[in-house]
Swiss-Prot record:
GO terms for molecular function: ATP binding; ATP hydrolysis activity; peptidase activity; proteasome-activating activity. Disulfide bonds: none annotated. Its main location: cytoplasm. SMART domains: AAA, ClpB_D2-small. One of its GO terms (biological process) is proteolysis involved in protein catabolic process. Keywords: ATP-binding, Chaperone, Cytoplasm, Nucleotide-binding. This is ATP-dependent protease ATPase subunit HslU.
């Protein structure tokens, strides 16, 4: 496993990006550490231990998805987020629940492939540079004599009419390429143009099947037809800099073993995969209406995936026995007990995420490594303007965000995005035309720009 961390270290890493929600962080940290512990056991016992899936309960915008996403990044695990409402019962038009596992395997293949390509990048760059030199200093083309078409049909060899290259010509070509290679290494040819033959990226005909529940069939047909028909290549005129990037990727593809990539990716998805099922509360119902019956059907389809089964993908059968499933929902209308009992039992760890307070909003604005105020300051700094928020101004923004959340829909930290856009709208528009080195945002400025939103309930309903 990549980055073996203790639960305390995992929580500390998550604290760099997510404010509060200690209970949820502790639960996912323990779940992750248990995976490492499981790998230390003997094979017989290891197969018996399955992950304890987690159910996160809390309003939108409090960090449910971000906790799961950051957790996956910490360990380099394949991660996929799906919405439970997108799935339909087997036999109906729509995506079937097994597609979430196929998506996870695709993500795993991409991760492993990127990792392998990084490992051969240096060798691929060397080969790409060699190809660029050959394009800049091409060898003489050999012409072929005209032959009877029937002879060509029956595979008879054509005769070269060119004389064999003399050793002097070969030495001259080698010397010219050596000099060109030296210039290339010094970066003197980066803006020169070369004509490169690359594989043509044609639009996928079967993309129309996406979302219809038939994407697996379309994928298999695409692969079958792709293997039967030769890949098209086209010529592109690129600078040496661009050509190196294109050719390096092409050479790296040749250097990696896709069978090995697939095998490793499937194993990674099975042992380390994390599936985040959002809006799981929306498929809960008491079974009194036809819609509730349909939603119950989706729950019953999800059940075997969560409790462990084998899903057929284009990379082969994939077991879900040891994947970690994290369910999440606001549960405003439905309750966790409205889920079918069998599914409730598959999410033994329940974590309730709390609503964000004024202090939480203040911390969200300034503490994380990717804090919103740091992002806006960096954007305006590209215009030569340094923007500074006073502590009082930050507190005022947090207070208004809390008030608007309480008076209208509670959308958590997402409220800050639009408030900051409204606050800095004039400044962002005028920034290229003003000659100011530093601008200080005060609580008075915040009040002037945002007070109307906080006071006017009807208006605040239009502010996301």
């Amino acid at each position: 496993m990549k980055n073996v961390l203790t639960p305390r270290q995992i929580v500390e890493r998550l604290d760099q990006y997510i404010v509060g929600q200690e209970g949820a962080k502790r639960s996912v940290a323990i779940a992750l550490r248990n995976r490492y512990r499981r790998f230390q056991l003997e094979d017989k016992l290891r197969d018996e231990i399955t992950p304890k899936n987690i159910l996160m309960i809390g309003p939108t915008g409090v960090g449910k998805t971000e906790i799961a996403r950051r957790l996956a990044k910490l360990v380099g695990a394949p991660f996929v987020k799906v919405e439970a409402t997108k799935f339909t019962e087997v036999g109906y038009v729509g995506r079937d629940v097994e597609s979430m596992i196929r998506d996870l395997v695709e993500t795993s293949v991409r991760l492993v492939k990127e990792e392998k390509m990084k490992g051969v990048k240096k060798q691929a760059e060397e080969q790409a540079n060699q190809r660029i030199v050959e394009l800049l200093v091409p060898a003489k083309k050999k012409t072929q004599a005209y032959k009877n078409p029937l002879e060509m049909l029956f595979g008879q060899q054509q005769e070269n009419t060119d004389h064999q290259e003399t050793s002097a010509e070969q030495d001259t070509l080698t010397e010219r390429r050596r000099r060109m290679s030296h210039q290339l290494a010094l970066g003197e040819l980066e803006d020169h143009y070369v004509t490169v033959e690359v594989e043509e990226q044609t639009p996928q005909f079967f993309d129309m099947l996406q979302g219809s529940g038939m994407e697996q069939m379309g994928m298999n047909m695409q692969e079958m037809l792709g293997n039967m028909m030769p890949k098209k290549r086209k010529k592109r005129k690129l600078t040496v800099r661009e050509a190196r990037r294109v050719l390096t990727e092409e050479e790296a593809q040749k250097l990696i073993d896709m069978d090995e990539v697939t095998q490793e990716a499937v194993s990674k998805a099975e042992q380390l995969g994390i599936v985040f099922i959002d809006e799981i509360d929306k498929i809960a119902g008491k079974g009194q209406q036809s819609a509730d019956v349909s939603r119950e059907g989706v729950q019953r389809d999800i059940l075997p995936i969560v409790e462990g089964s084998t899903v057929v993908t284009k990379y082969g059968p994939v077991s879900t026995d040891h994947m970690l499933f994290i369910g999440a929902g606001a549960f405003h209308v439905a309750k966790p007990s409205d889920l079918i009992p069998e599914l409730q039992g598959r999410f033994p760890i329940r974590v309730e995420l709390s609503n964000l307070t004024v202090d939480d909003f203040v911390r969200i604005l300034v503490e994380p490594d990717n804090a919103l105020l740091k992002q806006y300051a960096a954007l305006l700094e590209t215009e030569g303007i340094k923007i500074v928020f006073t502590d009082e101004a930050v507190h005022k923004i947090a207070t208004i965000a809390t008030e608007v959340n309480q008076e209208t829909e509670n959308i958590g930290a997402r409220r800050l995005h639009t408030l900051l856009e409204r606050l800095l709208e004039d400044l962002s528009f005028e920034a290229p035309d003003v000659n100011l080195e530093e601008i200080v945002i005060t609580p008075e400025y915040v009040t002037e720009k945002l007070a109307a939103i906080a006071k006017n309930r009807d208006l605040s309903q239009y502010i996301l």
